[in-house]
């Protein structure tokens, strides 16, 4: 198993697919990382040489990923909540933020139905 940014990558996958298992790296960024590291995107991870893996580590290290990115996102949400702005209030109440209707939908965000006591 190749280990990049603290994540074990599945050896049977192509490099650009395997890199997407790192939080903060999606399709576009994984292709950019492969291009910058001079690694063919359709190479299987098991076929990578040690210098190629090291080049990938260096390129991935240039981005904010994994724990740092999770912390940044959490701090941004906490800042919105502390500001008492509309988005912060919606986060605090666990409701949709972007204008979606909540009268009939939004069950995922609101959680399971709560029985009404008569």
Swiss-Prot record:
<dbReference type="InterPro" id="IPR018269">
    <property type="entry name" value="Ribosomal_uS13_CS"/>
</dbReference>
<dbReference type="GO" id="GO:0000049">
    <property type="term" value="F:tRNA binding"/>
</dbReference>
<keyword id="KW-0689">Ribosomal protein</keyword>
<dbReference type="GO" id="GO:0003735">
    <property type="term" value="F:structural constituent of ribosome"/>
</dbReference>
<dbReference type="GO" id="GO:0005829">
    <property type="term" value="C:cytosol"/>
</dbReference>
<dbReference type="GO" id="GO:0006412">
    <property type="term" value="P:translation"/>
</dbReference>
<keyword id="KW-0687">Ribonucleoprotein</keyword>
<dbReference type="GO" id="GO:0015935">
    <property type="term" value="C:small ribosomal subunit"/>
</dbReference>
<feature type="region of interest" description="Disordered">
    <location>
        <begin position="99"/>
        <end position="118"/>
    </location>
</feature>
<keyword id="KW-0820">tRNA-binding</keyword>
<comment type="similarity">
    <text>Belongs to the universal ribosomal protein uS13 family.</text>
</comment>
<dbReference type="InterPro" id="IPR027437">
    <property type="entry name" value="Rbsml_uS13_C"/>
</dbReference>
<dbReference type="InterPro" id="IPR019980">
    <property type="entry name" value="Ribosomal_uS13_bac-type"/>
</dbReference>
<comment type="subunit">
    <text>Part of the 30S ribosomal subunit. Forms a loose heterodimer with protein S19. Forms two bridges to the 50S subunit in the 70S ribosome.</text>
</comment>
<comment type="function">
    <text>Located at the top of the head of the 30S subunit, it contacts several helices of the 16S rRNA. In the 70S ribosome it contacts the 23S rRNA (bridge B1a) and protein L5 of the 50S subunit (bridge B1b), connecting the 2 subunits; these bridges are implicated in subunit movement. Contacts the tRNAs in the A and P-sites.</text>
</comment>
<dbReference type="Pfam" id="PF00416">
    <property type="entry name" value="Ribosomal_S13"/>
</dbReference>
<keyword id="KW-0699">rRNA-binding</keyword>
<keyword id="KW-0694">RNA-binding</keyword>
<protein>
    <recommendedName>
        <fullName>Small ribosomal subunit protein uS13</fullName>
    </recommendedName>
</protein>
<dbReference type="InterPro" id="IPR010979">
    <property type="entry name" value="Ribosomal_uS13-like_H2TH"/>
</dbReference>
<dbReference type="GO" id="GO:0019843">
    <property type="term" value="F:rRNA binding"/>
</dbReference>
<dbReference type="InterPro" id="IPR001892">
    <property type="entry name" value="Ribosomal_uS13"/>
</dbReference>
């Amino acid at each position: 198993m190749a280990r990049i940014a603290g994540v074990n990558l599945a050896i049977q996958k192509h490099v650009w697919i395997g890199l997407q298992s790192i939080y903060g790296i999606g399709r576009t960024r994984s292709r950019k990382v492969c291009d910058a590291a001079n690694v063919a995107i359709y190479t299987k991870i098991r076929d990578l040489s040690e210098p190629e893996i090291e080049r990938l580590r260096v390129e991935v290290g240039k981005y904010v990923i994994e724990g740092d990115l999770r912390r940044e996102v959490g701090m941004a949400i906490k800042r919105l909540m502390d500001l008492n702005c509309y988005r912060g209030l919606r986060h605090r109440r666990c409701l949709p933020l972007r204008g979606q209707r909540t009268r009939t939908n939004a069950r995922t965000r609101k959680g399971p139905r709560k029985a009404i006591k008569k």
